Design a protein with these regions (language model features):
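Amphipathic, Lys/Arg-enriched alpha-helical "gate/interface" segment within cytosolic domains
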Residues: 2-126
């Protein structure tokens, strides 16, 4: 049973595709098996820029299986993602955000939970 995956949403405006994901607790391989196929369907290449809003709530990290799935997804879409905004509450979540940088060409920024509107604005900018 999945623990960490909570929600996936798509918002499209003015040639920008923003995919929102919400996670909490610990992400495991089963979480990835649930949401990656949904992501792949949203990733249809139609020329739009793809950006992610990732909201972490009481996030504790990844299992090894989840890290492997994340690595595979990241390498497959290395050039496809333009920006990633990670919204969280604590230092651990910020460190996890820093860990993702080598696995993507996307510009990655961490925003505190209180700054979620700033994160959304940044993702919506051209």
């Amino acid at each position: 049973m999945t623990k960490g995956f909570r929600e996936i949403k798509l918002e499209e405006k003015e040639g920008i595709k923003i995919i929102s994901l919400r996670f909490n607790d610990v992400l495991d391989k089963e979480d990835y098996e649930l949401f990656v196929p949904q992501l792949e369907n949203l990733f249809k290449h139609d020329g739009d820029k793809v950006r992610f809003l990732i909201e972490l709530e009481n996030f504790k990290g990844f299992t090894l299986g989840a890290l492997w799935e994340e690595t595979k997804f990241s390498f497959k879409h290395f050039n496809d993602i333009d920006r990633i905004a990670v919204v969280g509450e604590n230092r651990t979540e910020k460190i996890i955000t820093e860990f993702t940088r080598p696995f993507t060409r996307a510009e990655v920024r961490f925003f505190h939970t209180a700054e979620i509107e700033d994160a959304k604005k940044w993702l919506s900018e051209s």
